[in-house]
Amino acid sequence: LRYGLKEFLSAIHAGRVVIGISGGIDSAVNAALYRSVLPAENLLLVNTPTRFNSETTKNLARRLAENLEAPFVELPIDSFINETVSQIDDLQIPSPSDMKTLHLTGFMKENIQARDRSTRILATLSSAFGGIFTCNANKTELTVGYGTLYGDLSGALAATADLWKHQIYALGRTLNRYFDKNMIPDEIFTVRPSAELSENQDITKGLGDPLIYEYHDFLFRSFIEPWNRITPEEILTWYSENCLEEKLGTPVSIKSIFKTHHDFITDLEKW
């Protein structure tokens, strides 16, 4: 990864990089990874909180930047989100036959946050800073499209896009050993993964992403990586034969995740 980063940045003549950091593991690992190939002054780390972001993750973002000794700015975006919502929600679109009114759902409003961060803040900052901005996505989320088009899926390079979530954690610990220092604070490894886009993703209440990475990493891997890709029907058969953990290689018990057969099947049908 370090070699690839060096070669890519050299090929596109990009010596400066802007990284949006949330206080979560994906952006922290990306920040540390880029720091391993670039001087600290060539990085700009940016935290863009809304009212849904906890003090925990905001503080972790600051600590990460301090540890990496990289320039850091915090740019709250609530007022801009509210302005976008006020412009679009209930907007009337005239047509020859009638008047159509647009409505923004809660899900749409969540995506506005991700798009504001990337297309307004990070893109503009990278231009002013004289560099590129990163996509911090991982393979688990990309496999099922858990991301926002024109939002957190944007960026010049997605360096960790071929790493499953458990590999992101492993890379984070490897980078800490590389630096011989906990550049990535220990708490980032333990805080619940969450996009923090709504009250339903409030980590202070134990809420977060809908993905159970200890299981879904291995489920999704079986769908896309083997030459003889596994089907949902085979997954269901293995589950009924009580050999799913062995077949997938999950580090956790399936029964500890899904209390009933219905829960398991509902989750399988979701993806």
Residue map of PLM features:
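ATP/NTP-dependent adenylation/nucleotidyl-transfer catalytic domains that generate, transfer
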Residues: 1-22, 27-271
